[in-house]
């Protein structure tokens, strides 16, 4: 056991985690030169296209160190985006140490800080690594000073390397073996294995990634899931070298995969403990804290025949992504679908894309909303995650919206722009600290504003230099109203949105104007209105298509023309009473862009 090292690689987006993993795999000979590809651990097509890591991946490598010993390295490559921070904390729970990778040109960013604090809270050994020293802009001395000032860990002897060219990577491995402690645990004790992650394989059923904390796991043994008491047979187990390799035994301290013919998706939830059926452990390992979704949106299949397939797909996906929440929902405009909870907008986009790609579904998304806390006049407190569930205005005593605490790190020259943006987003400054040329800003900003487009606009006002990390802080009373959209005097539930009263006129008007361009013209006038309660705040009309009924009249009496026009008018009136309006998919997407273009 003293030759095992478990560690994660944590870093801000684009600081070179996945490239460093590639180098480690190459040096330790995990894959042959022919099998090597760039970002070999980003196995999903989506990850490669966007150049980001979404799922944490684990690899077991053998490293022949300079002291003549052979060490087994189990490492987990983690995502850098704030939306996937849950993946990071799960990966860290399986490790004794972490490599904190910092870009030697850009320096410390908000996500570096957040992930590093997560690692420190779990008492992990953090080894700082300065990456990209081959860049002309690299300034390792300034950055190591920054790590000490902002993060507060000793970085005087931080390893300097370039994952792209391979310079200094062997030093990273040596430092790992030296500084990160071996796993603790009792190889002779009863088996306790933590499920770090699981996914669904069409041939094998549920595949789980486990970290053996105590005892050993052998092929063919009866395994018991502690939370449900179910007993399964360990059919196959093994390690990733990134390829899946079978082994007969997983020893104490190792990280490996396990297949035990679980067909039920909820059979072995992530964060659960596995033990032996004949000699069970007394208590389960502490799992992971449940994450609360921050953003909710309705997802509906375009054709109602896909509902069953959509439900199965969500089940399989939620096995692989424990932070996804979903419950059935029906809408008069869109039929049956699911209300899903996500950690952020990027998470939502990724899930929608994965559903459409991996499971061949066509989906409509409604506008994302956050959770509001509502105090009703009866003294009850209810939590509302969609505009449709909001009680009528006269039943609401107080409406509270979630406030996010946002930590931003940015160069001084962009400070003015960023503060202006925060004020526009109704933010309140709580802290500001200067570290050399960097400024650390803390603002309390309503979650609804953060999830909408705050991140994109923060990046554009600071030319990409500012970085953001946010977490939920509290609920605060606020003057929020629901804006309904009426089409021909009928409310369309899927188009409603909750917004602040100050912005409601403007939002309503903008939404109505956008819808006007998107709804195809019919044989009769279509009135599009935005309303708060019974009060109409904006209206526009999609003009009817009409035939020129006077074309056949050459001269003649005016009463003849009047008669024809009146006849047409009556016909249109009748049509309007029975006609219904088909809304195109773009109309639902219009709400997503309300408030983005003009500011």
UniProtKB/Swiss-Prot annotation:
GO terms for biological process: positive regulation of translation. It catalyses: GTP + H2O = GDP + phosphate + H(+). One of its GO terms (molecular function) is translation elongation factor activity. GO terms for cellular component: plasma membrane. Its EC number is 3.6.5.n1. It is found in: Cell inner membrane. Gene3D superfamilies: 3.30.70.240, Elongation factor 4, C-terminal domain, Elongation Factor G (Translational Gtpase), domain 3, P-loop containing nucleotide triphosphate hydrolases, Translation factors. Residues 2-184 form the tr-type G domain. The keyword Mitochondrion does not apply. GTP binds at residues 14-19, 131-134. The keyword tRNA processing does not apply. HAMAP family: LepA. Belongs to the TRAFAC class translation factor GTPase superfamily. Classic translation factor GTPase family. LepA subfamily. Required for accurate and efficient protein synthesis under certain stress conditions. May act as a fidelity factor of the translation reaction, by catalyzing a one-codon backward translocation of tRNAs on improperly translocated ribosomes. Back-translocation proceeds from a post-translocation (POST) complex to a pre-translocation (PRE) complex, thus giving elongation factor G a second chance to translocate the tRNAs correctly. Binds to ribosomes in a GTP-dependent manner. This is Elongation factor 4. The lineage of its organism: Bacteria, Pseudomonadati, Pseudomonadota, Gammaproteobacteria, Enterobacterales.
